[in-house]
Amino acid sequence: MNFTCKIYHSGGFFTTARSLYSTLCHDVYARDMAVIPHFTRSSSADDIASALTSFGCVIIDELVDHQQVEALLSEMQPFIDATPLGQDDFTGRTTQRTGALLARSAASIDMVAHPLVLEVTQKILGLSATTFQLHLTQIISISPGAPAQPLHRDQWCFDFFEFPAEMDVEISTIWALDDFCELNGATRVLPNSLMEPSSAVTQTDRTVAAEMTKGSVVMYTGRTIHGGGANQSTAVRRGLNVDYILGWLRQEENQYLSCPPEIARTLPENVQRLAGYAIGAYALGYVDDVRDPNAVLNGRDGGSSFGGLEINTPNLA
């Protein structure tokens, strides 16, 4: 893959650019520039969340090691090979979308539940909900010759409901399982598009390729206009798409069938809860006699409580 993405390996250019982007993300004038702020694995969640809510997108460079990526691909390759191509232009007629990663790959947990990603997500989604949950897990394999995906907003999956303009209901991530560059179909994003009208999806000339090295991750919000890039290289471009949503919204990937109880109970408890085996709000997701789903999953009684939260009744006087 290196021959398609030489920008990352020539003359220290990427290191210099990454430093520049990291500086720009703290510069008020960068708001008007078509760049994606870059961060490192040692950056603070506060700084990343601030840039994400300002620009709508950030890249955290080399957040996991190549060995972690290779472990994931080794476990998932048989499932990728068996995945059919998409049946429409949006899904991608030369693109494979392979899901159910929690059930199929132990190595996926390194990325699906990465502490820094979850901390950033909590800082943003925590403003609008008691909890957040996993929305989907999917390896996207874009074959050579694939055209660019139509631009869109991820939160349109909620029946195109018009949420309040400044409200974030979803945080999306795409992990680079190969080096991402414009030539091989790096995800294209429209920086500063959070408040843009929906008609901006036609402005493909304003998009920027999320170029990054293997093991890096691009994060963007449900309001950010973006789309998969055209793969003009000779190799498949692979990325891991993991999205998170508010605890009171429906998940795109049905985790309870994709990762059923007999598999879910083998996962770490924080991952079980992230997948949705938990109370989503004080009265959402309980089991039978108002029992906590995580307790039931793990063979505990679970009591009888609407989440154990104190409910503050609005003052309607």
Give the predicted meaning of each segment.
Residues M1-S54, P314-A317:
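Fe(II)/2-oxoglutarate
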Residues V28-S54, D61-D159:
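Non-heme Fe(II)-dependent double-stranded beta-helix
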Residues R97, R104, H135, V169-I171, ...:
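Residues that flank catalytic or metal-binding motifs in active/ligand-binding sites
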Residues P115-E119, I171, T213:
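A structural signal for well-ordered alpha-helical segments within the folded catalytic domains
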Residues L136-I139, T173-W175, L240-Y244:
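A structural signal for short, well-ordered beta-strand segments
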Residues I140, D179-F180, R223-T224:
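Short Ser/Thr-interspersed hydrophobic loop/turn segments at strand-loop and sheet-helix junctions
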Residues A146-M212, L249-C259:
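Catalytic core of non-heme Fe(II) oxygenases with the double-stranded beta-helix
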Residues E196-M219, R223-T224, G229-A317:
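Conserved double-stranded beta-helix
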